[in-house]
A protein has these predicted regions:
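Hydrophobic transmembrane alpha-helices
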Residues: 76-83, 124, 157-162, 184-196, ...
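Membrane-interfacial helix-loop-helix junctions in multi-pass membrane proteins
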Residues: 62-66, 145, 197-251, 261
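Hydrophobic alpha-helical transmembrane segments of multi-pass membrane transport proteins
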Residues: 59-140, 163
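Transmembrane alpha-helix boundary and packing residues in multipass membrane permease domains
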Residues: 87-91, 135, 139, 169, ...
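Alpha-helical transmembrane segments and their short interhelical loops
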Residues: 112-185, 190, 235-242, 246, ...
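Transport-system extracytoplasmic interface segments
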Residues: 1-84
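Short helix-capping/hinge motifs at transmembrane helix termini and TM-loop junctions
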Residues: 90, 94-95, 108, 141-146, ...
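Short cytosolic juxtamembrane segments of multi-pass membrane proteins
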Residues: 258-265
Length: 265
């Protein structure tokens, strides 16, 4: 006559999916309990039921209170880096081309690769400053937990920053004016926000949208950020997200170098 007890553990790092999973789990428990309760009832007796036959204990991991900011704020770090690194790099190079200063730099003994690295280093420093400021604001205002290694977080941020700096350089080789560079940057940025899992869970997207999302570095960086900050996951368990992100970084670097050398030649 004692209730059957069961425990359900839910990954609550995404509060939207976790809330849906908790609701569905409770619904299953009630659906299993009702036939048993009806079978116990007798016409000549009436009593109050204090405990369901299926006693379900649900526990949410990583974000038990389902705080939405714990999920949103880490993603904002990636969104901020995506927008700024890609846009400021592409527009800065195009601006120098419009002014004619880029051609003056190319007449010096500096190699095109050295020029590209020189352009990327200051913006990479800006990117690390943005990560630091976002972390400080997230901790002080939104009480975001940091359960993993900050060193690993900054290391993965380096690859992500270089990835979008390279994409910004590639955009600068495909455009002639600052307006064109800004428009192309926004053309890439908006689908990235929608398909990376920042606004909507990727599991609920159509298959073509999920495939397109895999072509965007932000998709992988989102998982890395939330894995390190919310779950305390080590790098060894994040390789399925890290390797594609690094692969896209090298792809964008190679394409930007090829295009840049063609233009300088």
């Amino acid at each position: 006559g004692r209730p059957a007890r069961a425990q359900v553990l839910v990954d609550a790092s995404d509060p939207i999916i976790a809330a849906s999973a908790l609701s569905n789990t409770q619904g299953i428990a009630y659906a299993q309990s009702l036939p048993i309760l009806y079978g116990r009832l007798r016409p000549e007796t009436s009593y109050e039921v204090s405990t369901l036959p299926v006693d379900l204990e649900v526990r949410g991991w990583y974000n038990p209170d389902l705080v939405t900011s714990f999920y949103i704020v880490p993603g904002l770090i990636g969104v901020l880096l995506t927008m700024t690194m890609m846009m400021i790099t592409s527009m800065a190079i195009v601006k120098e081309r419009e002014r004619g200063t880029l051609e003056q730099l190319l007449t010096t003994p500096i190699q095109p690769m050295e020029l590209m690295i020189g352009k990327m280093v200051p913006y990479a420093a800006v990117g690390f400053m943005q990560v630091t400021i976002a972390l400080v604001v997230g901790i002080m205002i939104f009480k975001i937990p940091i359960r993993g290694s900050l060193l690993a977080l900054y290391g993965m941020s380096f690859f992500f920053i270089v990835c979008y700096l390279s994409l910004g350089l590639l955009i600068s080789t495909l455009t002639r004016t600052q307006q064109q560079a800004m428009q192309l940057s926004f053309f890439i940025f908006l689908p990235t926000i929608l398909l990376s899992g920042f606004m909507f869970p990727r599991a609920g997207m159509p298959l073509p949208a999920q495939i397109l999302g895999l072509l965007m570095p932000l998709t992988y960086f989102m998982e890395v950020l939330r894995g390190i900050l919310l779950k305390g996951v080590s790098i060894t368990l994040l390789w399925r997200w890290i390797i594609p992100m690094i692969g896209l970084m090298f792809l964008f670097m190679a394409l930007s170098v090829i295009r840049f050398r063609k233009q300088t030649d």
